[in-house]
A protein has these predicted regions:
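Bacterial Sec-dependent N-terminal signal peptides
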Residues: 13-48
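Primarily marks secretory-pathway-exposed extracellular/lumenal segments that are disulfide-
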Residues: 20-28, 106, 140-142, 174-175
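Surface-exposed helix/loop patches within compact recognition domains
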Residues: 52-145
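N-terminal helix-cap/turn-to-beta initiation motif at the start of protein domains
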Residues: 27-33, 136-150
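Residues at beta-strand starts and edge strands
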Residues: 84, 134, 147-151, 163-167
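Sec-dependent bacterial lipoprotein signal peptides
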Residues: 1-14
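Edge beta-strand at a domain terminus
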Residues: 35, 39-40, 152-176
Length: 176
């Protein structure tokens, strides 16, 4: 009995021992981390009540370019039902071979900005809708079981007419 209680005590100590966090282990995409590591992940981009919402039946594509030493990722989200295409032009430091995770604010092509001149909606009749303000949040699992990066992209834009354009896309981006 004495040996059994010692064995159980050792088993309890080993079972309760904290695991060592491996910084090389990728964090799967999620919409929040409860303030544990990357605070930007806790920021919510509200897509509710949008006049135009890119969510279901969307095909996502990306073109990877380089501009002034920055990664210039040009994303298109095509709505198969309406024929609308949302273009996102994101700039980030050249770190990964996929779209850099983070929050992109409206800007002019500096690091971690969504370029205000090249983020817009293209309508089937070839007209464009430009935005006056916006934000994009990108979460990525670069080691998804499919073998390709898996993205969760949320975005919210406003145009001159105060219409809200939003995106909540989950899936892979086909490289062009």
């Amino acid at each position: 009995m004495k040996y059994l209680s010692i064995l159980l005590a050792l088993l309890f100590v080993v079972a309760c021992e904290p695991t060592v966090d491996n910084p090389d282990t990728p964090t799967p995409p999620n919409t929040e981390d409860d303030g544990k590591d990357d605070s930007w992940m806790d920021e919510i981009i509200d897509t509710s009540g949008a006049d135009y919402l890119f969510k279901d039946g969307i095909t996502g594509k990306v073109m990877f370019l380089e501009y002034n030493g920055l990664s210039n990722d040009y994303i298109s989200l095509f709505d198969n039902a309406t024929g609308l295409t949302l273009f996102l032009d994101l700039y980030s430091p050249m770190v990964y071979d996929y779209v850099t995770p983070g929050i992109y604010t409206f800007g002019d092509g500096a690091a971690m900005t969504a370029h205000r001149d090249y983020c817009y909606i293209h309508f089937p009749d070839d007209t464009l809708m430009r935005f006056t303000d916006g934000r994009v949040k990108v979460i990525v699992d670069p080691e998804h079981s499919s073998g390709y990066p898996y993205y969760h992209i949320t975005a919210r834009f406003v145009n001159d007419a105060e219409e809200v354009i939003a995106a909540d896309y989950e899936g892979q981006l086909i490289a062009q």
